UniProtKB/Swiss-Prot annotation:
Name of the gene this protein is made from: ndhH
Source organism of the structure: Ceratophyllum demersum (Rigid hornwort)
Family membership noted in the UniProt record: Belongs to the complex I 49 kDa subunit family.
GO cellular component: chloroplast thylakoid membrane
Protein name, entry field: NAD(P)H-quinone oxidoreductase subunit H, chloroplastic
Topology versus the membrane: Peripheral membrane protein
Catalytic activity: a plastoquinone + NADH + (n+1) H(+)(in) = a plastoquinol + NAD(+) + n H(+)(out); a plastoquinone + NADPH + (n+1) H(+)(in) = a plastoquinol + NADP(+) + n H(+)(out)
Function (record text): NDH shuttles electrons from NAD(P)H:plastoquinone, via FMN and iron-sulfur (Fe-S) centers, to quinones in the photosynthetic chain and possibly in a chloroplast respiratory chain. The immediate electron acceptor for the enzyme in this species is believed to be plastoquinone. Couples the redox reaction to proton translocation, and thus conserves the redox energy in a proton gradient.
């Protein structure tokens, strides 16, 4: 009987695009030597829908329903960046009450996004229980969204100069109750997960990124803050009303998958602190800037002499973008979400360039997984937190 020689050649494996741990239609072409990862090549584009080109043929208000399909788990942030760009371009003032309502919605959306990151991340590394736990709190957030906006996910709530509607009666008390309840839920997560020896074995020291390396790769959000760089656009850019509240930037210096987990867990607690302060100090007044609805110039034949300003009370397609360029960014749950806008004295943007955080953060994946074990790919990819709708646009 002859014993066959061991094969020495490498194995190439496709992970995705249909794979339960891929977080969307991401395909990884992985080169393996046994269990060791030699190379990894991400293949993108399976969810490309031409979002930037669509923006060039829509007014801002017409485009708002599209943007909620970028990062469909944190839709308030895509709406915020879409209205912030023309607001800054046209120097439009947002009423204080509208700004406070926006902050509440953004932070609730941040918590919902982090929760739906935590559950699948834990499932990827073998812990099924938190996956079911996170839906309790997330469902309460979606109930609040539904009461305020009418929709659970694709809210279409932000408007140029404010928000679509005021908070309904009793909503503030309901939200305060949620904040008190959620803090106990986070304590439960920390007891279940943070010191679990099996969890620590899977994430500690896995996927380490140094601070300088994170900056060179252009990383942002929890990916950057977990590498020892306390950089948060809410503190840096002073947008909305974040300067009026007392909160801290959450960061860790280790740079591994555990650090990225800790940053996100602590960020949820900080978001609750911000929401509680907003709810206690929310002022009265209008929830949108009525001046935005006016024509900036007399009507012309561009709209076939149809009087658009009387269609409804919301900003009409006649809102013009002046001939200048602007880059606007917000601190989304996954990192820096930015839009580069070029106006052309038209109701349509001449160029609408999206800077999605997931697309930039995903670039470092091949470097992180090389020389690691095959099972570590899921841990590292899960700790990056990507949504393919925003990566492929």
């Amino acid at each position: 009987m002859t014993v066959p020689d061991k094969r020495k050649d490498l194995m190439i494996v496709n992970m995705g695009p249909q794979h339960p741990s891929m977080h969307g239609v991401l395909r990884l072409i992985v080169t393996l030597d046994g269990e060791d990862v030699i190379d990894c090549e991400p293949v993108l584009g399976y969810l490309h829908r031409g979002m930037e080109k669509i923006a060039e043929n829509r007014t801002i208000i017409q485009y708002l329903p599209y943007v909620t399909r970028w990062d469909y788990l944190a839709t308030m942030f895509t709406e915020a960046i879409t209205v912030n760009a023309p607001e800054q371009l046209g120097n439009i003032q947002v009423p204080k009450r509208a700004s406070y309502i926006r902050v509440i919605m953004l932070e609730l959306s941040r918590i919902a996004s982090h929760l739906l990151w935590l559950g699948p991340f834990m499932a990827d590394i073998g812990a099924q229980t938190p996956f079911f736990y996170i839906f309790r709190e997330r469902e309460l957030i979606y109930d609040l969204f539904e009461a305020a906006t009418g929709m659970r996910m694709m809210h279409n709530f932000f408007r140029i100069g404010g928000v679509a509607a005021d908070l309904p009666h009793g909503w503030i008390d309901k939200c305060l109750d949620f904040c008190d309840y959620f803090l106990t839920g986070v304590v439960e997560y920390q007891k279940l997960i943070t010191r679990n020896p099996i969890f620590l074995e899977r994430v500690e020291g896995v996927g380490i990124i140094g601070g300088e390396e994170a900056i060179n790769w252009g990383l942002s959000g929890p990916m950057l803050r977990a590498s020892g760089i306390p950089w948060d656009l809410r503190k840096v850019d002073h947008y909305e009303s974040y300067d009026e509240f007392d909160w801290e930037i959450q960061w860790q210096k280790e740079g591994d998958s555990l650090a990225r987990y800790l940053v996100r867990i602590n960020e949820m607690i900080e978001s609750i602190k911000i929401i509680q302060q907003v709810l206690e100090g929310i002022p009265g007044g209008p929830y949108e800037n009525l001046e935005v609805r006016r024509f900036a110039r007399p009507k012309d034949s561009e709209w076939n002499d149809f009087e658009y300003r009387f269609i409804s009370k919301k900003p009409s397609p006649s809102f013009e973008l002046s001939k200048q360029e602007l880059y606007v960014r917000v601190e989304a749950p996954k990192g820096e979400l930015g839009v580069f806008l070029i106006g052309d004295n038209s109701v349509f943007p001449w160029r609408w360039k999206i800077r999605p955080p997931g697309f930039i953060n995903l670039q470092i994946l091949p470097q992180l997984v090389k020389r690691m074990k095959l099972a570590d790919i899921m841990t590292i990819l899960g700790s990056i937190d990507i949504i393919m709708g925003e990566v492929d646009r």
